[in-house]
Amino acid sequence: ELRQKVFETARDWFSFPQHERLHVTVADAWHTLETLPVASTAMIVTDLYSADRMSPLQAQRRFIKACARALKPDGWLVLNYHRMPEPDGNLLRELKRQFPCLLTFKSKTNNWVIYGCNRAFDPWQIPDAVLKALEEQLPVGWPALMKKIRVL
C-alpha cells in the first residue's frame, strides 16, 4: 500500500486480517518490487488505484516480470483491473509468458481479478473440506467464488 492511512483504515474498520505470515508493505510498489529478493514471496496482491484511476504501472510488462521474479515457485500473483486486458494485447501475452496458470473472475464491482501461478492448478478439484478450512482463514466466500472462476 502506498499510503499508511489506507492500511490503517483497512485494518481498523474493514477486518483486514492480521497474521504472522502476512506482511503489508507501505511503500511505492515499483520500488518495493525492485528490491525484493528473487523467489522470496508467496503471494503478491496488487490493487494499484489512486482516487480516480488505476495506476498505469499495474498494466506494464515490466511490472508483471518483476512480480514473477519475486514470487516463489509455488507463489501466486493476484491483480485487480478495472477492465479485462485485451485478449491479444501485450499485457495478457506477458501474463501468459510468466504464469502458465491464469484464472480470472469478474467481481461484484465489475472489476476483473486475475490470479497467476507457476504450477499446474485445477480449481475445480478442490475438495469442499479444503474450501471450508480456507474460509476460516480468509473469509471471502470461497465456494461461491470458485463457481465464478474461469481459466484464461
Residue ranges and their predicted role:
Residues 93, 108-152:
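SAM/dcSAM-binding transferase cores
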Residues 1-69:
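The AdoMet/dcAdoMet-binding core of the Class I SAM-like
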Residues 50-51, 82-87:
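Short "lid" loop at the C-terminus of a central beta-strand within the Rossmann-like core
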Residues 65, 89-110:
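Conserved Class I S-adenosyl-L-methionine
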Residues 58, 83-85, 111:
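Alpha-helical subdomain
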Residues 74-81:
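Conserved beta-strand signature within the Rossmann-like core of class I S-adenosyl-L-methionine
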